């Protein structure tokens, strides 16, 4: 359905036989009503044309080629002067062939058939409304037993013999033998009921409002009883109360949606449009057909056989009629959901037929693959890799993907700058990958965000906006802090990239969907852009230097790996390697890049004269005096250089290159935030 705002919506539910007939029936210009599929044939083996009244009939579903009828006559579509609008010889309308994608047909069933979704799927809606065990209803549907009709003030065959409902099982094989087909049909319609028709009668007699009232009264009575002390009885009461709640909710849903319970039993079976169950020709002249066509043929064969038994044959035993009704029910079950009753139906190659349920459900079904996950223009897909040098709101887009996504914008830029005279020349420049193309692409991408999506999109953070930058390679680069929102990692995950085209979509992406504006979880409000996995390991490596002070390094001989102690060959004690001094962090990082020190090697870094570094009442571990009168006071984690007059000249802190790098990153982030805040105010 489409509402007034043109939002397309899809609702799945039960429909009435009248609605099915309205969908599938059409009236030809000569007044003839068509829509019923009566023959199980598809194409004629000689003419290779659809059979009349078959599963691909052009009278029912429309012409295969636009404006051409089954006879080969041609009419201009939409020309009002052309008359008639259909072929009087074959009855095919001169319309567009796309009608075969949505024009339905129907099969008029010779007996009512229960919809297997409502009977066998758990919870069973039919069993819930009728308040009967599912096994009992299955036996009734598949003609394993019958029940007596409540006929008052009339003598009946069953009542004269004193039979009751539970005794009819013994008459299953004996009663039909006394009647012909016509006589048994009269007897059954009068006194007994079985099959899906019995279910339909019971559902039609239900009053949903009375069901709600009675269920609420029973629920209150069970609640007043309280606990009995018997665990088994208490569980039984609890299960019954849960059942009553589900029954009330189901009845309210039927009332709210104007659905009648008897619609769960089918009298008319819809036939899908031919284009949704095609027969195609492959190499070698062989034909490939959708499995649904074979399942439809099975239903039509059995339904036609039952129709012949009920109308033409008068000497057929009633038991054969009941068996044929069971076969029709099983054929419809297989069409709707193959394998739901046990062993699935297979073809000659032992391959399971794909039923209607198999076509629409699952990851490769019609909804998730074709409707929800369909391919769209201005989109791409690639593997994600980590981009540690990216900002939080940026993503790295490979050149190959970027030039395809923004090709129309690049063409417009080339023409506007008079670098190309037309679209063809612009495309040739793009194919040749001239340098000017990448310059224009950079300009286009600067003001155009892109959307990254990782399936499954379970919450709103599954799709976020980023500012793209060109990167080499063929993988999308992503900042590691946004991975938690996507539930992504870098072990081969793929992400889709989309380009918002309209101005409204770009504004929405900038104001609502940018990654740096989605730092908190929308569900619980906790921070979601937090370090995980590789980032935690990296932080550990950066800060895994000396945590125990100078004493351990200098005097503990076992700690020679981290602090580069070397064993002398002439005696049994260790040589201490002097820890280097650096006047600033740039010199320390430069020494690391030159491989003069390791990432976790301890060093002395000159620090600003901050009294907070100096611990009060702490005595130095060592004091080193120099010839000029200055001396060094060495403490556990810092060092003070004093003058001859004991004035503090310098302070050195004991740290590692990893700590320095982490501190610089934090300091730059704070300074950037301060600048942004000051400019904003």
UniProtKB/Swiss-Prot annotation:
Q: Give the enzyme's EC designation.
A: 2.7.7.6
* Enzyme class label: transferase
> What name goes with this protein?
DNA-directed RNA polymerase subunit beta'
GO BP terms: namely: DNA-templated transcription
The source organism is Nicotiana sylvestris (Wood tobacco)
Residues recorded as binding Zn(2+), renumbered to this chain, are 69, 71, 87, 90
Annotated gene: rpoC1
Name a GO molecular-function annotation: DNA binding
What is this enzyme's catalytic activity, as reactions? RNA(n) + a ribonucleoside 5'-triphosphate = RNA(n+1) + diphosphate
- Compartments in which it is found: Plastid, Chloroplast
**Subunit notes for this chain?**
In plastids the minimal PEP RNA polymerase catalytic core is composed of four subunits: alpha, beta, beta', and beta''. When a (nuclear-encoded) sigma factor is associated with the core the holoenzyme is formed, which can initiate transcription.
């Amino acid at each position: 359905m489409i509402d007034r705002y043109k939002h397309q919506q899809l609702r799945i539910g039960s429909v009435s036989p009248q609605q099915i007939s309205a969908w599938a029936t059409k009236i030809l210009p000569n007044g003839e009503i068509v829509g019923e599929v009566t023959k199980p044939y598809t194409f004629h083996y000689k003419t290779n044309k659809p059979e009349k009244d078959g599963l691909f009939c052009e009278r029912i579903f429309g012409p295969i080629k636009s404006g051409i009828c089954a006879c080969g006559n041609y009419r201009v579509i939409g020309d009002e002067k052309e008359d008639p609008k259909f072929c009087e010889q074959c009855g095919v309308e001169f319309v567009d062939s796309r009608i075969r994608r949505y024009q339905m047909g129907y099969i008029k069933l010779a007996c009512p058939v229960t919809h297997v979704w409502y009977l066998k799927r758990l919870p069973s809606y039919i069993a819930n409304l009728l308040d009967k065990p599912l096994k009992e209803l299955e036996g009734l549907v598949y003609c394993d037993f019958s029940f007596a009709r409540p006929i008052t003030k009339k003598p009946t065959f069953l009542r004269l013999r004193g039979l009751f409902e539970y005794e009819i099982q013994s008459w299953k094989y004996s009663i039909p033998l006394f009647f012909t087909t016509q006589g048994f049909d009269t007897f059954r319609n009068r006194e007994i009921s079985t099959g899906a028709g019995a279910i339909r009668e019971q559902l039609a007699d239900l009053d949903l409002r009375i069901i709600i009232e009675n269920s609420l009264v029973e629920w209150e009575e069970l609640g007043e009883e309280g606990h009995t002390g018997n665990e088994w009885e208490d569980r039984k009461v609890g299960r019954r109360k849960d059942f009553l709640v589900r029954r009330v909710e189901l009845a309210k849903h039927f009332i709210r949606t104007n659905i009648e319970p008897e619609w769960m039993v089918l009298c008319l079976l819809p036939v899908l449009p031919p284009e949704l169950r095609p027969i195609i020709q492959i190499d070698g002249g062989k034909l490939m057909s959708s499995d649904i066509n074979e399942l439809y043929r099975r239903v039509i064969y059995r339904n036609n056989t039952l129709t012949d038994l009920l109308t033409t044959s008068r000497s057929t035993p009633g038991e054969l009629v009941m068996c044929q009704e069971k076969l029709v029910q099983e054929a419809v079950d297989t069409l709707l959901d193959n394998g739901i009753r046990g062993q699935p139906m297979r073809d000659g190659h032992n391959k399971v037929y794909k039923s209607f349920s198999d076509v629409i459900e699952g990851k490769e079904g019609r909804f998730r693959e074709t409707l929800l996950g369909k391919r769209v223009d201005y989109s791409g897909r690639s593997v994600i890799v980590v981009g540690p040098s990216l900002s939080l709101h940026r993503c790295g887009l490979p050149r190959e993907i970027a030039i395809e996504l923004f090709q129309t914008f690049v063409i417009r830029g080339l023409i506007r700058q008079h670098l190309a005279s037309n679209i063809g020349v612009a495309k040739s420049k793009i194919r040749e990958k001239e340098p000017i193309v990448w310059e224009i692409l950079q300009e286009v991408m600067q003001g155009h965000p892109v959307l990254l999506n990782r399936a499954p999109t379970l919450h709103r953070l599954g799709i976020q906006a980023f500012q793209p930058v060109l990167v080499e390679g063929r993988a999308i680069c992503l900042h590691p802090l946004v991975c938690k929102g996507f539930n992504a990692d870098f072990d081969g995950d793929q992400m889709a990239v989309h380009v918002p085209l309209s101005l409204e979509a770009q504004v929405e992406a900038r104001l609502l969907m940018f990654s740096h504006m989605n730092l908190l979880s929308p569900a619980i409000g906790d921070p979601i852009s937090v370090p995980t996995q590789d980032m935690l390991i990296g932080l550990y490596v950066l800060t895994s230097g000396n945590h125990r002070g100078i004493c351990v390094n200098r005097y503990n001989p076992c700690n020679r790996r981290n602090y580069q102690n070397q064993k002398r060959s002439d005696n049994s004690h260790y040589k201490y390697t002097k820890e280097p001094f650096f006047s600033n962090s740039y010199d320390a990082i430069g020494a690391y890049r030159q491989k003069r020190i390791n990432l976790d090697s301890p060093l002395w870094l000159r620090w600003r004269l901050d009294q907070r570094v100096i611990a009060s009442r702490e005595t130095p571990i060592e004091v080193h005096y120099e010839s000029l009168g200055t001396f060094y006071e060495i403490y556990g984690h810092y060092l003070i250089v004093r003058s001859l007059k004991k004035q503090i000249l310098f302070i050195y802190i004991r740290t590692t290159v990893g700590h320095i790098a982490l501190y610089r990153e934090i300091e730059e982030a704070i300074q950037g935030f301060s600048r942004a805040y000051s400019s904003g105010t």
